């Protein structure tokens, strides 16, 4: 499952963005591990994995320190730490990804 998540990733402004299709028992753990591993992709400063759980879209965010994912996730109603953060959105996967891309754009514009 983790490999499938990583394989779905695309790079946007030095961020790896991936999504988990469907739901499975350990989706939260798989998403977190995938976000960690995606930081190993050359040129990536942050990673984000979107997955559905409990009727919401969750985003697990990781950073190597160059991008403050806490600030990005806080702008979307979440929180966390400089290198590890998350948020939950009451929307669908497509809209969540659009919101994430807007939040990344805003972060880069302001930092």
What are these model-predicted stretches?
Residues 1-75, 80-111:
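Hydrophobic helix-and-loop "lid/oligomerization" segment in the mid-to-C-terminal part
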């Amino acid at each position: 499952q983790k490999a499938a998540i990583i394989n779905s990733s695309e790079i946007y402004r030095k961020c790896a963005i991936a999504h988990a299709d469907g739901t499975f028992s350990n989706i939260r753990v798989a998403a977190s591990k995938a976000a960690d591993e995606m930081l190993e992709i050359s040129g990536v400063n942050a990673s984000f994995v979107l997955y559905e759980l409990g009727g919401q879209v969750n985003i697990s965010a990781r950073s190597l320190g160059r991008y403050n994912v806490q600030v990005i996730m806080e702008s979307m109603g979440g929180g966390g730490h400089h290198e590890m953060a998350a948020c939950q959105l009451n929307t669908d996967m497509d809209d969540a990804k659009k919101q994430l891309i807007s939040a990344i754009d805003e972060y880069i514009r302001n930092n």
